[in-house]
Amino acid sequence: MQLLGSVASPFVRRLRLVLAGQPYQFVALNIFESEGRSVLVQHNPARKVPVLVDGEQVIFDSGVIYRYLASKLKFKPLSWDQENGLTTINACTDSLVELLLCKRSGFDVTEDKLFFNLQHERIQATLEALEQQIRAGHFGDWDYPGISLFTLIDWILFRDLVDLKPFPVLLQFRNAHLNRPMVAETDPRLS
């Protein structure tokens, strides 16, 4: 199996952590340079990372890749509450990615514009919801939802996207998992 993706992507990192201890090859791509982009385009018409290549089978999207891996590796199925938690994590991550790309494209994402306002609103609401879910005992295991939350929080800090001081429970959650297997090895700060 090969996992194609960028070192910094939280969607890629979550799968690298899920695959800790499993036989696979990570192929690091810089999707903003022609060589990495060319490899990505050969495998995924949506031009997004991650991509899993397992023999002749090619899978796109971190959620779909996880379902494939869960079936292949016999992971415990996710509950509906866990699926909802993942949806919340993914919504926050997607909005942060959109704003980061807009900012890198020269837009002032603090302008009072509908698109930017909706992203900021979603980010705030999802972070509040995730903080409450941790307080309620969710994300207690180091499984796909917990790993996905960890990679989101750590990526926010890495990219300095949101001030997380108002979310002490999220910060505590992240800090509690820093010594997990492969966390240090997959840290985007090291690339």
Predicted regions and their residues:
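GST-like domain detector, emphasizing the conserved glutathione-binding G-site
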Residues: 1-114
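Short, hydrophobic secondary-structure boundary micro-motifs
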Residues: 77-78, 108-109, 165, 184-189
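Long hydrophobic alpha-helical segments typical of transmembrane helices together
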Residues: 169-191
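Short, contiguous strand/loop micro-motifs
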Residues: 2-3, 161, 185
